[in-house]
Amino acid sequence: MSKEVIVESFELDHTIVKAPYVRLIGEETGPKGDIISNYDIRLVQPNEDSIPTAGLHTIEHLLAKLIRTRIDGMIDCSPFGCRTGFHMIMWGRHTSAKIAAVIKDSLKEIAETTTWEDVPGTTIESCGNYKDHSLFSAKEWAKLILEQGISDDAFERHVI
């Protein structure tokens, strides 16, 4: 007998969301009461645009470092296969507004001050696809996303 599985992201109506935004997808409570939260960090509008892999890859590496300097409890921040944003998994509860502020501040640093030397994990030893990076693309996309503003609501624009 197979277990019915519902994957929340496949149930989301991608035609009604308004990117860029941060959305709490859900929370799980572990056997000892620990809470893990899953966030949809949507940077571009689904089915209208996508971030090229080299730029998204560089944003991924930078966010892995930058988010951890701004908030405790990040477990992982991984890109969606559709290249419109990231899943971010966190210990504990945080408001979408708090996460949006962290993402905004991180993207601002990418856009304004990040140099190639700041990008972690860009060697053959530290990355499984080390040649597929573009700081130029990451910076340009960060600027575009910041110009649009990041909302803490996926369905109504409430820019933080």
UniProtKB/Swiss-Prot annotation:
Q: Which residues form the signal peptide?
A: none
- According to its UniProt record, which reaction does this protein catalyse? S-(5-deoxy-D-ribos-5-yl)-L-homocysteine = (S)-4,5-dihydroxypentane-2,3-dione + L-homocysteine
Which cysteine residues pair off into disulfide bonds?
none
Recite the UniProt keywords alphabetically.
Autoinducer synthesis, Iron, Lyase, Metal-binding, Quorum sensing
**Which cofactors are reported in the record for this sequence?**
Fe cation
Using the UniProt record, name the top-level EC class of this enzyme in a single word.
Answer: lyase
InterPro entries on file:
LuxS_sf, Metalloenz_LuxS/M16, S-ribosylhomocysteinase
Q: How is the cofactor bound?
A: Binds 1 Fe cation per subunit.
- The protein's Enzyme Commission number: 4.4.1.21
Q: Which GO terms describe its cellular component?
A: cytosol
One Gene Ontology term of the biological-process aspect is: quorum sensing
- Which GO molecular function terms does the record list? iron ion binding; S-ribosylhomocysteine lyase activity
Q: Does Metal-binding appear among the keywords?
A: yes
UniProt-annotated binding residues for Fe cation? H57, H61, C127
Q: Does the keyword Iron apply?
A: yes
Q: Which SUPFAM superfamilies match?
A: LuxS/MPP-like metallohydrolase (SSF63411)
Described by its record, this protein's role is as follows: Involved in the synthesis of autoinducer 2 (AI-2) which is secreted by bacteria and is used to communicate both the cell density and the metabolic potential of the environment. The regulation of gene expression in response to changes in cell density is called quorum sensing. Catalyzes the transformation of S-ribosylhomocysteine (RHC) to homocysteine (HC) and 4,5-dihydroxy-2,3-pentadione (DPD).
Q: Which family does it belong to?
A: Belongs to the LuxS family.
- The protein's assembly and partners: Homodimer.
This chain belongs to which protein, by name?
S-ribosylhomocysteine lyase
Species this protein is from = Streptococcus pneumoniae (strain ATCC BAA-255 / R6)
